[in-house]
Amino acid sequence: MSETPSKQTAASDETGAVVAPEPGPVSQWLNKQGFDHNILEPDHLGVEQIGVDAAVLPMIAAALKSNGFDYLQCQGGYDEGPGEQLVCFYHLLAMAEQVEAMVADPSAKLREVRIKVFLNREGTPSLPSIYGLFRGADWQERETFDMYGIQFEGHPHPKRLLMPEDWKGWPLRKDYVQPDFYEMQDAY
């Protein structure tokens, strides 16, 4: 997990000592199954987050799908800033078991997890597509490619979705310079 930044995996306690986040239920299950991953801080809603290497993403996604995470709610990317890493994320839900659980208990909590893959922005960032596991990844992976330049190996339609095919660059990267754009100066 060399590309996963340490700033994402540690917090400080009252004394200032670095404390690793507690593994959540999904992380504990992955550990029992022998999958290497990094434990990340839960998000602001308490959703468990894990960091994985690009090479093992399909295996971990398949394992999670077999463990009930049957729905890809969202896939996307973001840029941590110029000179920093690009991040590709997958938000998985256990929908089938949720429907069954809600029949018995309407307040049942939905199982969800967010997988993050940290990529070097230099060269051509790429990772395996999970289109074969989750068909909903089709347009979402294409949009991430179109906006950030992250290529998804094995995707059946690897072309731009929103921008023209001849567009240069990746518009949502923070170091992107819009072609033929001139900033207007105030008249004052």
Curated annotation (Swiss-Prot):
Q: How does it sit in the membrane?
A: Peripheral membrane protein
- Protein localization: Cellular thylakoid membrane
Principal location: membrane
Its BP terms in the Gene Ontology are: photosynthesis, light reaction
Q: Compositional bias (Polar residues) spans?
A: 1-12
Supply the EC number(s).
7.1.1.-
Q: Name one GO molecular function term.
A: NADH dehydrogenase (ubiquinone) activity
Reactions it catalyzes: a plastoquinone + NADH + (n+1) H(+)(in) = a plastoquinol + NAD(+) + n H(+)(out); a plastoquinone + NADPH + (n+1) H(+)(in) = a plastoquinol + NADP(+) + n H(+)(out)
Q: Does the keyword Signal apply?
A: no
Enzyme class per UniProt: translocase
Tell me what this protein is called. NAD(P)H-quinone oxidoreductase subunit J
